[in-house]
């Protein structure tokens, strides 16, 4: 199973929407720039029928170096989380049911 890349998305826009290749690549880049910009300004990103990207603050917690067993603190940080929407969940579940 492969991975969907930004280049793949641009190619689909080129083939299905009729944009030229440069415009298609720019549109994909612009989309991801908007998502990054919104998240960097602490905004939630809601994509109807797909899901939501949220920011979550994680507190500092104790961790352990797997090689030495030494306890080390894992610093507090902000992470991006994704929660799939109902339509995406249903599509994935339907697809998973067709696998053998």
Curated annotation (Swiss-Prot):
Q: Which GO terms describe its cellular component?
A: cytosol
Cystines in this chain: none
Q: Which InterPro entries match?
A: Hist_DNA-bd, Histone-like_DNA-bd_CS, IHF-like_DNA-bd_dom_sf, IHF_alpha
| A GO term, aspect molecular function | structural constituent of chromatin
Q: Gene3D superfamilies under this entry?
A: IHF-like DNA-binding proteins
* Pfam assignment, any one: Bac_DNA_binding
- Keyword vocabulary terms for this entry: DNA recombination, DNA-binding, Transcription, Transcription regulation, Translation regulation
Picking any one GO biological process from the record gives: regulation of translation
Q: Which domain of life is it from?
A: Bacteria
Query: According to its UniProt record, which protein family does this protein belong to?
Result: Belongs to the bacterial histone-like protein family.
PANTHER family linked to this entry: DNA-BINDING PROTEIN HU, INTEGRATION HOST FACTOR SUBUNIT ALPHA
- Tell me the function of this protein: This protein is one of the two subunits of integration host factor, a specific DNA-binding protein that functions in genetic recombination as well as in transcriptional and translational control.
Q: How does it assemble?
A: Heterodimer of an alpha and a beta chain.
Under HAMAP family, the record lists: IHF_alpha (MF_00380)
Q: Under what name is this protein listed? A: Integration host factor subunit alpha
- Species: Hahella chejuensis (strain KCTC 2396)
Lineage, opening ranks: Bacteria, Pseudomonadati, Pseudomonadota, Gammaproteobacteria, Oceanospirillales
């Amino acid at each position: 199973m492969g991975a969907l890349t930004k280049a793949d998305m641009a190619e689909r826009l080129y083939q299905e929407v009729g944009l030229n290749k440069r415009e298609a690549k720019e549109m994909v880049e612009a989309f991801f720039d908007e998502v990054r910009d919104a998240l960097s300004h602490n905004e939630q990103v809601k994509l109807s029928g797909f899901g939501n990207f949220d920011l979550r603050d994680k507190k500092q917690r104790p961790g352990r170096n797997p090689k030495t067993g030494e306890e080390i603190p894992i610093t507090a940080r902000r992470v991006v989380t994704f929660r799939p929407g109902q339509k995406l969940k249903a599509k994935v579940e339907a697809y998973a049911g067709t696998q053998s």
